[in-house]
């Protein structure tokens, strides 16, 4: 299938994506490496939450490592200069990150809901073994759902009159192909709408339980409520604009006439590309939310960073502290037992 050239979009991508992606790389790669260390140690302490956090950080890190390729692509005004196989792999990891992230965020929300609302029930759902099984299932299912990108031809050549040259596009072409429309509609429903509703319901129930629990101090209540709001806002801001524009794109381009593209369709595509760039910020938000928002998370992360940079004190006591994890729940919601 051919692609229609949108000259203005190439110019926008040339400046927008490198700026956003460079920021994400600088912040998210060290943050997610630290988060992997912290969550791994938590998982060793029989924490099911550590399993979900580890998977979330791994997904973010894998995507962040592909961003240099996308920076080169957009800096060259949407011209893919690498092999088609790298295009397929980069697109695969990008969408794997989008929808594995929403899945793991949902798992964390459900886990916190069970811990707070039903602290004396459903113990088997809050074991490390169960969390490991769920995480592996998510990785396998997301691999299957996104595998279509590994065998479909993801590169297409378009000619732009303004540039008087050909451009090799990677995956995101205009208009969408039929298989892309069907896949995106499926993703929007199962990978965004269902997780969003689940997170909203779980967080609302947790908020109600915390608010009416007299055994919890006001300071602790405020911290928990702040965390719940942060989780919801981060999910909505990172993923809602993208999926709204993706849904509009699918509707407008479902029966588009290639020879007669409307201005509204092109404007929608421009807005969609902006939301793609903003979605990458979830790689920054995730480690901040789930490792820095609590006192124990910040302390363990800081010790690991000092250890990695060689500035850690050589005393045996501090070394032992680096390799230990507080038994206090990272999310600090277990106070309601």
From Swiss-Prot:
Protein name: G-protein coupled receptor 65
Glycosylation sites: 2, 79, 166
MF terms in GO: G protein-coupled receptor activity
Site residues by UniProt (Required for activation): 142
Residue ranges that the UniProt entry lists as topological domain Cytoplasmic: 43-46, 119-126, 213-216, 294-337
Effect of residue 243 to F: Decreased proton-induced G-protein coupled receptor signaling
Pfam families documented for this protein: 7tm_1
UniProt keyword Acetylation present: no
Listed SUPFAM superfamilies: Family A G protein-coupled receptor-like
Native species: Homo sapiens
